[in-house]
Amino acid sequence: MSLLTEVETPIRNEWGCRCNDSSDPLIIAASVVGILHLILWILDRLFFKCIYRLFKHGLKRGPSTEGVPESMREEYRKEQQSAVDADDSHFVNIELE
């Protein structure tokens, strides 16, 4: 009984791999998927804060302020700032000088 497998066979006094079917489309597809998975995983680890912040808050920029009086713009800015200052039911009081 031999301990050698089909993959590990002695070829010319060295251990090697017989890869006669390396042009098989399934092997090529699996290699491409593996490489893409590795690239996406690396990008995810490098930029996870930016990526998940975009998913959480979206790309909201707010409504256009064109044609709106400056007093209303300032009121809207204060409302938005107070909404940002509230963090998971912990409200932050900011005193202006």
Swiss-Prot record:
GO terms for cellular component: host cell plasma membrane; membrane; virion membrane. Keywords: Disulfide bond, Glycoprotein, Host cell membrane, Host membrane, Host-virus interaction, Hydrogen ion transport, Inhibition of host autophagy by virus, Ion channel, Ion transport, Lipoprotein, Membrane, Palmitate, Phosphoprotein, Signal-anchor, Transmembrane, Transmembrane helix, Transport, Viral ion channel, Virion. GO terms for biological process: protein complex oligomerization; symbiont genome entry into host cell via pore formation in plasma membrane; symbiont-mediated suppression of host autophagy. This is Matrix protein 2. It is a single-pass type III membrane protein. Residues 1-22 are virion surface. Cytoplasmic tail plays an important role in virion assembly and morphogenesis. The M2 protein from most influenza A strains is inhibited by amantadine and rimantadine, resulting in viral uncoating incapacity. Emergence of amantadine-resistant variants is usually rapid. Residues 44-97 are intravirion. The gene is M. It is found in: Virion membrane; Host apical cell membrane. Residues 71-80 have a biased composition (Basic and acidic residues). It comes from Influenza A virus (strain A/Malaysia:Malaya/302/1954 H1N1). Belongs to the influenza viruses matrix protein M2 family. The modification Phosphoserine is found at S64, S82. Glycans are attached at N20.
